[in-house]
Amino acid sequence: FMDACDELGLFVIVNTPGWQFWNDAPEFAQRVYSDIRNLVRRDRNHACVWLWEPILNETWYPDDFAKKTRELVDQEYPYPYCYSGCDSGARGKEYFPVLFTHPSFDGKAWGDPNADPKITYFTREWGDNVDDWSSHNSPSRVARNWGEQPMLIQARHYANPTYTYTCYDALYRTPRQHVGGCLWHSFDHQRGYHPDPFYGGLMDVFR
């Protein structure tokens, strides 16, 4: 995968394995630190690597853990243009040069109303808009076989909806320190927690 991204010129954010779980036993953090060292050593010579995300995604971890993960990345790749990032609301965010957030919409919706002009911002994932995590009652979740009109609603939601939401137009209008974002998701796919597929992608297996 990384070789293909190098060849095609696709940027990659390399994430540490782990999600929504923390264990206070000391060996848990030590194993995460080992994972970070190994993944940086594995991928540091790939041209496609744009950013490292060494913290555990959506996890309530100690503040000193965040600082240590940033230090580990810098130790394993002690060269210019080595960037690490985390969520703008995460513990230890002050240790990272890149923060993940949404455009602020003048403080009317998601985003960081206290954006720091010295920090680079990126929207790690945007687009999905649901009333619950199981249904498809959403302008962003549309199956291709539902027809043209639902697909146009989905396209408008992603491009420039009439309501306040992160979209292509909103990302285009951000100041230059906000360097873009990644749509969630690129393609329809099966979900492990529900029998119906996720229909929020720009593509499915047939297009």
Where does each model-flagged region fall?
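Substrate-binding/catalytic cleft of secreted carbohydrate-active enzymes
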Residues: 1-207
